[in-house]
Regions:
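A short local loop/turn or secondary-structure capping micro-motif enriched for an aromatic residue
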Residues: 17-20, 39, 88, 115
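The catalytic Nudix box helix
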Residues: 23-55
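Structured beta->alpha junctions
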Residues: 12, 27, 57-59
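N-terminal strand-loop-strand
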Residues: 1-23, 50-54
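Non-DNA-binding regulatory cores of transcription-related proteins
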Residues: 88-89, 93-94
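Active-site-adjacent beta-strand/loop module that shapes the phosphate/pyrophosphate-binding cleft
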Residues: 60-86, 97-103, 113-125
Length: 126
């Protein structure tokens, strides 16, 4: 998770006629730790480089285990990149944006069960 005061970086999606948002992230490759995967995915999807401050919590996303990390020492400017940029088209769009807690429901932040914990985290850091 990349925070900026009371905002978190999300990827707004439009796919198969559905609008929603997710946190940048993805799968763990063979031989990779979850922390290494989080840093790699962040860079691949956003061009940002960061360090991990700490693991925040674990859960499930799309029926797969998910580990959520708080990023620190974030460098660069968030720009869509990697497979998401290559696949970006009107019927399958990707857009990086900063979101406040009061925008989570409107954006359809997924998975929905992280909204409350993330809102608390933003309230403490904002």
């Amino acid at each position: 998770m990349v925070l900026d005061g009371d905002r978190v970086l999300v990827m707004k999606r439009h796919k198969r006629g559905r609008d929603y948002a997710v946190l940048p992230g993805g799968g763990v490759e063979p031989g990779e730790t979850t922390a290494e995967a989080a840093l790699r995915e962040l860079h691949e999807e956003t061009t940002l480089v960061a360090e991990i401050d700490r693991m925040l919590w674990t859960g499930r996303h799309n029926d797969r285990p998910a580990t959520y990390f708080l990023m620190t020492a974030v460098r660069g400017q968030a720009r869509l990149s990697g497979p998401e940029a290559a696949a970006n088209r009107p019927d399958n769009s990707f857009e990086l944006r900063w979101a406040t807690a009061d925008q989570f429901a409107e954006l359809g932040l997924h998975p929905a069960d992280i909204r409350g914990r993330l809102a608390q985290l933003l309230a403490r850091s904002g």
